[in-house]
């Protein structure tokens, strides 16, 4: 089950039907990762820089906003509460503008990135980063989104 909390109302102005959009991304990813049948509960909070900066400071001691924060709660098992993913619209807008990509594509990427973190993937070491990015690229491709790690013309 995907629980979606729209903390920052501006999401409605930027993403068409944000709840349906989020469910499509997460469910497509869970199916492709062969874990949909576990029926995990995942909470997604559509937030802003203010909340992400507060959480980033509280949990990571970094006093600045960020694009996505993930909080894993349980290892994957049937019907578990897997974790929470928080995304900041403000940061995603700035980054997608800088990258010259649609906000929907960048949001999809960050949601998948956050999902992989709550599934215990990380990018601390080069091999881990390669594995995580490869999975992101594959999942984004399923959604019709180009590889975000290939430099684009601006």
Curated annotation (Swiss-Prot):
Its EC number is 3.1.-.-. The keyword Nuclease applies. It comes from Ehrlichia chaffeensis (strain ATCC CRL-10679 / Arkansas). SUPFAM superfamilies: Metalloproteases ('zincins'), catalytic domain. Zn(2+) binds at residues 113, 117, 123. Binds 1 zinc ion. The lineage of its organism: Bacteria, Pseudomonadati, Pseudomonadota, Alphaproteobacteria, Rickettsiales. This is Endoribonuclease YbeY. One of its GO terms (cellular component) is cytoplasm. It comes from the Bacteria. Belongs to the endoribonuclease YbeY family. GO terms for molecular function: metalloendopeptidase activity; RNA endonuclease activity; zinc ion binding. It is found in: Cytoplasm. Its cofactor is Zn(2+). Keywords: Cytoplasm, Endonuclease, Hydrolase, Metal-binding, Nuclease, Ribosome biogenesis, rRNA processing, Zinc. It is an enzyme of class 3 (hydrolase). It holds the Pfam family YbeY.
């Amino acid at each position: 089950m995907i629980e979606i909390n729209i903390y920052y109302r501006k999401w409605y102005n930027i993403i068409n039907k944000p709840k349906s959009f989020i469910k499509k991304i997460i469910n497509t990813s869970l199916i492709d990762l062969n874990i949909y049948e576990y029926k995990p509960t995942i909470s997604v909070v559509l937030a802003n820089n203010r909340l992400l900066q507060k959480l980033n400071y509280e949990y990571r001691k970094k006093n600045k906003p960020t694009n996505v924060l993930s909080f894993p709660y349980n290892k994957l098992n049937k019907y578990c509460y897997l974790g929470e993913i928080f995304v900041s619209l403000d940061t995603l807008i700035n980054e997608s503008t800088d990258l010259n990509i649609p906000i929907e594509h960048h949001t999809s990427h960050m949601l998948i990135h956050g999902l992989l973190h709550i599934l215990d993937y990380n990018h601390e070491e080069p091999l881990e980063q390669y594995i995580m990015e490869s999975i992101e690229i594959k999942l984004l491709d399923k959604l019709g989104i180009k590889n975000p790690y290939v430099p684009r013309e601006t």
